[in-house]
């Protein structure tokens, strides 16, 4: 059978919190089968757990956070969640000694590196996928996102930013998902923001960790980072990274075709909730062997080495 995945060993890293600008220690721990993805704040006494769940997601101006029934939150989970989706990690406990996951370089690549460093282990339980059975679409003005049935996982994302630094030819990106494709084409794409927004937020004591080290920063005319872009179309690739993380908030890789126009965290989450709320639109599936498994989810040699 196709088995659930966790980590082989505990790994730790430090980074800076986007909101506070303070040092954050991140610890990734293996977890038994059927645990799911658990985010944990150890700065609270007793520690508070936040299971990844589409209904717990709140989108703020700066990030995605998970909120529990007592209105306690853990922030900036989206890029780590994308790395978990990319490598198909089903069970993990993610601990931080702060209210937020460190921003690292603004992409998912440092988290991918950390997960690969921990090593990935298969557990003796069947991996559950969410398979899309009916088309589901959500809209917000001219923005929209939809899932259609498809035996694999494809993503097709279009942005519409009217900015001199973002060429019109680089506003759409489509890919057949796989762990290899995610690592090579998506994981290194960084988040982006306007210099004026960062300066305004910092003047109000917010976004204190925001810098050229953790984002693509633009003014009204150009990219301000000395090293420029990692990809010509890094902006839309990062929006796809965000979507991969947002859609993994159900704790399972999804089998279906995702298409979006000008979508963001809130609309991605609205789509995921709309799918899960419509019983006939999806089902859980497991696979007995590699031959049945959609190509998108075959483990690359780098993951299960």
Swiss-Prot record:
Cofactor: Zn(2+)
Reaction catalyzed: a UDP-3-O-[(3R)-3-hydroxyacyl]-N-acetyl-alpha-D-glucosamine + H2O = a UDP-3-O-[(3R)-3-hydroxyacyl]-alpha-D-glucosamine + acetate
EC number: 3.5.1.108
Gene Ontology molecular functions: metal ion binding; UDP-3-O-acyl-N-acetylglucosamine deacetylase activity
CC per GO annotation: membrane
Active site annotation, chain numbering: 265 (proton donor)
Residues holding Zn(2+): 79, 238, 242
Pathway as given in its UniProt record: Glycolipid biosynthesis; lipid IV(A) biosynthesis; lipid IV(A) from (3R)-3-hydroxytetradecanoyl-[acyl-carrier-protein] and UDP-N-acetyl-alpha-D-glucosamine: step 2/6
Source organism superkingdom: Bacteria
Matching InterPro entries: Ribosomal_Su5_D2-typ_SF, UDP-acyl_GlcNac_deAcase, UDP-acyl_GlcNac_deAcase_C, UDP-acyl_N-AcGlcN_deAcase_N
GO terms under biological process: lipid A biosynthetic process
Cross-referenced SUPFAM superfamilies: Ribosomal protein S5 domain 2-like (SSF54211)
Record keyword Zinc present: yes
Entry keyword set: Hydrolase, Lipid A biosynthesis, Lipid biosynthesis, Lipid metabolism, Metal-binding, Zinc
Gene3D superfamilies: lpxc deacetylase, domain 1 (3.30.230.20), lpxc deacetylase, domain 2 (3.30.1700.10)
PANTHER family named among the record's database cross-references: UDP-3-O-ACYL-N-ACETYLGLUCOSAMINE DEACETYLASE 1, MITOCHONDRIAL-RELATED
Functional note: Catalyzes the hydrolysis of UDP-3-O-myristoyl-N-acetylglucosamine to form UDP-3-O-myristoylglucosamine and acetate, the committed step in lipid A biosynthesis.
Record-stated family: Belongs to the LpxC family.
Database matches in NCBIfam families: lpxC
Protein name: UDP-3-O-acyl-N-acetylglucosamine deacetylase
Organism lineage string: Bacteria, Pseudomonadati, Pseudomonadota, Gammaproteobacteria, Enterobacterales
């Amino acid at each position: 059978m196709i088995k659930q995945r966790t980590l082989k060993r505990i790994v730790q890293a430090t980074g800076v919190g986007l909101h506070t600008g303070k040092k954050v220690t991140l610890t990734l721990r293996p977890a038994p089968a059927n645990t799911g993805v658990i985010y944990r704040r150890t700065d609270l006494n007793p520690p508070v757990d936040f299971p990844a769940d589409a209904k717990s997601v709140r989108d703020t101006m700066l990030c995605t956070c998970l909120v529990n029934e007592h209105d306690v939150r853990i922030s900036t989970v989206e890029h780590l969640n994308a790395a978990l989706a990319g490598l198909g990690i089903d069970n993990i406990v993610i601990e931080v000694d702060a209210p937020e996951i460190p921003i690292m370089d603004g992409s998912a690549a440092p988290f991918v590196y950390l997960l690969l460093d921990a090593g990935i282990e298969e557990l003796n339980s069947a991996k559950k996928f969410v398979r899309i059975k009916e088309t589901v679409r959500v809209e917000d003005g001219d923005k929209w996102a939809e899932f259609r049935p498809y035996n694999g996982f494809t993503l097709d994302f279009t942005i519409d930013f009217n900015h001199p630094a973002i060429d019109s030819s680089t506003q759409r990106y489509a890919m057949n998902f796989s762990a290899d494709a995610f690592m090579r084409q998506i994981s290194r794409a960084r988040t982006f923001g306007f210099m004026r927004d960062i300066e305004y937020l910092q003047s109000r004591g917010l976004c204190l960790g925001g810098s050229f080290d953790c984002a693509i920063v633009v003014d009204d005319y150009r990219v301000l980072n000395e090293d420029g872009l990692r990809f010509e179309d890094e902006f839309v690739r990062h929006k796809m990274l965000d979507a991969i993380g947002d859609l993994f908030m159900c704790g399972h890789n999804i089998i279906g075709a995702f298409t979006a126009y000008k979508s963001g965290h809130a609309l991605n989450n609205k789509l995921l909730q709309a799918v899960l709320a419509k019983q006939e639109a999806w089902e859980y599936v497991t696979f007995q062997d590699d031959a049945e498994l959609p190509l998108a989810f075959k483990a690359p040699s780098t993951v299960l080495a």
